[in-house]
Amino acid sequence: MPALGSPRRLLGSLNCTPPATLPLTLAPNRTGPQCLEVSIPDGLFLSLGLVSLVENVLVVAAIAKNRNLHSPMYYFICCLAMSDLLVSVSNVLETAVMLLLEAGVLATRAAVVQQLDNVIDVLICSSMVSSLCFLGAIAVDRYISIFYALRYHSVVTLPRAWRIIAAIWVASILTSVLSITYYNHTVVLLCLVGFFIAMLALMAVLYVHMLARACQHARGIARLQKRQRPIHQGFGLKGAATLTILLGVFFLCWGPFFLHLSLIVLCPQHPTCGCIFKNFNLFLALIICNAIVDPLIYAFRSQELRKTLQEVLQCSW
C-alpha cells in the first residue's frame, strides 16, 4: 500500500498517506534535521504483541469459564479483550512475517504480501473501531448501573446486550473495509478522527458525572457519620485518581494515532507535521500498550475474575 512514512508497519493505508483530494506528497527532506524519530525494534513489537495476546486470552477464558461472569458488563469486557486480541494477533502475525521476509526464510510473491497486508489492515482497523465502541459501551453500562440501579436489569438485558455486541462487530467490520478501500479520501480520515473525539467526549462526560454522584453519595454518608471532611476528601481523591487513570490511559494511548490522522489532512507538507509522521510506528506501539493495559483496568480489578483466572492458570499447568 502506498505510504509516505516507513512501510515498517502494515497499517500502511493510514500511514502518512495524503488523501486523494489533497494531491500533496511529503518529501523526506522536508521534515528537517531536528526531527526526533523514535525507532521501535521488531523484537519490541513482537514482545508487546505476545504479552497482550496472553493477557487477553486469559480474560476471555476466565469469563467463558465462570458462569457468574456471564452478565452484560462482563460480556462487554470480554468483547473488549477480543478486540485487543485482534490487535495482538495482527501485530504478531505482521511482525513475524516481516522478520521471516527480512531473513530470507519466507519467499513469496509481492501480490501475496499485498493481500496479507490488506487482511491485516482490516483486522487492525476492525479491532481499533470495536475497541473504542466497547470502551464506550462499558462506560454506558456503568453509568446506567449507578444512575438507574433499580431499573438496570430491565434496561441492560442479555438479549439487548447481545444485539449491541453484534451491531458493534458488524459496524466495525464494515467500517474497516470501507476505510481500507477508500483510505485515500479525506472524509475517511475525518470520520475516524471524529469517532475518536466522540468516544472520548462520551467517556469523559459519563465518568465525570459518575464521579460527581459518588462524591455526593460520600458526603451523605459523611454527614450521617459526622465525619464529613475525612471521608469526602479520601473518596474524592480516590475517585479522581481512578477517573484520571481511565481517561488518561485512553487519551495517551489513542490520542497520538488520531492526531497523526488529523495532521495528514491539515498539514501533509509542513516540516513539523512531517516530524510527527516519522513516528507512526510509535503511535501503533502505544495502541498495543493500550491492549496490555485494558485488562488491568477493566478486568483484573474484579475479585471474581481474578479468582477464576487463578483456576484457569492452575488447570493449564
Curated annotation (Swiss-Prot):
A lipid is attached at C315 (S-palmitoyl cysteine). It comes from the Eukaryota. One of its GO terms (cellular component) is plasma membrane. Its main location: membrane. Glycans are attached at N29. It is found in: Cell membrane. It is a multi-pass membrane protein. InterPro entries: GPCR_Rhodpsn, GPCR_Rhodpsn_7TM, Melcrt_ACTH_rcpt, MSH_rcpt. GO terms for molecular function: melanocyte-stimulating hormone receptor activity. Residues 1-37, 94-118, 184-191, 267-279 are extracellular. Keywords: Cell membrane, G-protein coupled receptor, Glycoprotein, Lipoprotein, Membrane, Palmitate, Receptor, Transducer, Transmembrane, Transmembrane helix. Residues 64-72, 141-163, 212-240, 301-317 are cytoplasmic. SUPFAM superfamilies: Family A G protein-coupled receptor-like (SSF81321). Receptor for MSH (alpha, beta and gamma) and ACTH. The activity of this receptor is mediated by G proteins which activate adenylate cyclase. Mediates melanogenesis, the production of eumelanin (black/brown) and phaeomelanin (red/yellow), via regulation of cAMP signaling in melanocytes. Belongs to the G-protein coupled receptor 1 family. Interacts with MGRN1, but does not undergo MGRN1-mediated ubiquitination; this interaction competes with GNAS-binding and thus inhibits agonist-induced cAMP production. Interacts with OPN3; the interaction results in a decrease in MC1R-mediated cAMP signaling and ultimately a decrease in melanin production in melanocytes. This is Melanocyte-stimulating hormone receptor. It comes from Capra hircus (Goat). The gene is MC1R.
